[in-house]
Structures are given as C-alpha cells and as structure tokens.
A protein has these predicted regions:
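Proline-centered turn/helix-capping motifs that create local helix->coil transitions or kinks
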Residues: 138-142
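Acidic, negatively charged sequence signal
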Residues: 143-149
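N-terminal leader/linker segments that precede catalytic domains of diphosphate-processing enzymes
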Residues: 1-58, 63-118, 122, 126-127, ...
Length: 149
C-alpha cells in the first residue's frame, strides 16, 4: 500500500505557484511492523484557545517562514512544534497539489511515512492527537458527502 501511495505521488503534476501566502501541512502515515499492523493517518484537533481553525480536525502544519529552506521543511518544523514529531523518524514520500484555504492561503500537503515509534506531545495549539486506520478512510461505506452552506 505504501509503494502505491508513493507511485501515485510521483505521477502528480504540480500546480503553478499561486502567489499567495504559503503554508504547509504534514500528512503522517504511521506504519512500522513492531507496533502498527496496518497504516494509520495522524491527525490533530486544534485547541479552542487558538484564533483560527479552533476545534477543527487537521494535519499538523503552519505558515512558511523565511528560515525554512522549502515548504516540506515548513511542514516538518511545524509538526515538531505542534506534536513533537521528530523529522529523523520521517521518510518523505512526496507532495500533493496545494489547495487554497478559506483564509486565501496556499496550503501545501506533504506526505511522509513515520518509521519509528515515538511519543507525540501536543503543544498549546493542539487539543488532541489522534490516528485513524487508512483502511477505514479508504472504505467507501465510511464516507459521507455533505454540502455545507
């Protein structure tokens, strides 16, 4: 399954730069033989104390800073700040095309395999850290399409 994800990411055609403020998120796939039997996706729940995205389920991430060499580094830096993710435990698989958020920010998702068990610790921006089995997310009977106005 991981090889299939990597192959699909390699085939993506990147979008042209949007010239908007940039941010990056990390889509972490936890999968290591000794601990997890099938891949799980790492999510966070944003704290009710933050001004944007309060209470939302999200991926760890944030805005690009000038000290960041690239947007992948932004995603990993923010993930370390928010949940104590060690970048040395990550095997970068690739990137998805960006989306423009409701706040008019270009959000760039990076997908990585978390290869070692580690303790995740939420900072004050994060209320909860959770994982969801990838098989659950891929099962059509678990999907609901709902239009929100």
């Amino acid at each position: 399954m991981i090889d299939s994800i990597k192959q699909k990411l390699e085939k993506l055609n990147p979008l042209n730069d949007s010239n908007k403020t940039k941010a990056a998120v990390f889509i972490g796939i936890l999968y290591f033989d000794d601990y997890i039997e099938s891949p799980e996706i790492l999510f966070t729940v944003r704290s009710s104390k933050v001004s944007t995205h309060s209470g939302e389920v999200s991926f760890p991430g944030g805005k690009w800073e000038q000290a960041d060499k690239n947007l992948c580094e932004t995603a990993l830096r923010e993930s370390e700040e928010e949940i104590n993710l060690k970048s040395s435990n990550v095997n970068n698989l690739g990137a998805l095309n960006y989306l423009i958020s409701r706040h008019d920010i270009e959000v760039n998702p990076f997908v990585g395999l978390i290869t070692k068990k580690q303790d995740f610790v939420a900072n004050d921006e994060i209320e909860k850290i959770l994982t969801v089995p990838l098989n659950f997310l891929l099962n059509p009977s678990n999907l609901i399409n709902q239009e929100i106005e």
